Amino acid sequence: MRALSLEQANAIIAATFAAAEQHKCRPMSAIILDAGGRVKAFQKQDGASMLRFEICQGKAYASLALGRASRLVLAKAKEKPLFMQSAGELADQAMFLEGGGQLIRDAEGEVVGAIGVTGDVNEMDDICAIAGIHAVGLKSDYDFDDPEQIRKLSILKAPPLTDPRKK
């Protein structure tokens, strides 16, 4: 597994913010964690409110800790609250259970890090995060369609993302 570079991390965040501007999102914040859960980069747009670092980090950390998009971690919390309570205690409450956290994978599907984005509705946080990942030629779980590869990589696919503000 190759490491995620600082240059890639900063480029992912820049592309995430560009997508947010394109979609007319509220001020965003984004964090990149390496595969070991350590902070690689964080940025907060002007006008973003407080606690954004902690929220972004919690979304990305939840994705890494449980190997799935943070919106699927939220679904698991609803299915198995005792499991998630125990996991939260083990993680010193470091996980934030909302959409906006995505695993970052290389071309082979190995996890090289995670992104956490917050500032708008969860779906838009995810859409912008995935745009950032794609901008540097990396992949999210949404990019894998081969059933054998999905099984091998233990990918859990979330339902397709759409902008809920356009309903």
Task: Specify the residue positions occupied by each region the protein language model found.
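Flexible, solvent-exposed loop/hinge segments and secondary-structure transition points
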Residues: 1-167
